[in-house]
Amino acid sequence: MIRIAFLITNKFLEIDSTTLAGYDFSGMNLHRAILNGYCLDGAKFEKTHLRNVMIQHTSTRNAVFHNAALMNAILNNSDFTGSDCSNSRSIGENFKAIDNHGKDIINGKGLSNVCKIHYNV
């Protein structure tokens, strides 16, 4: 059982699994979820509400964030290699020290509607 905490609300989401790798979060409301340190490789976040989510020090290789709402997400020091962020909505995120192995997550399969972002890749 994995227990995901949410900022400010003191709420939790319990997932009956031993790993989040490959987990399908599509369409879920994960506003303010703390996903720091989990392995999210291959996870699906299609049309997921990820506003103010924290994904720090996390592997998200080959994860799918297609059409996800990523406004004000904190994505520091995470590995997004091979992840699909196409058509995701992102305003005000912090991408400090994201490891994308030289691939551009902003163009191509990157984020759309990007502004006010601090890049340090």
Where are these regions (language model features)?
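Tandem repeat scaffolds
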Residues: 1-121
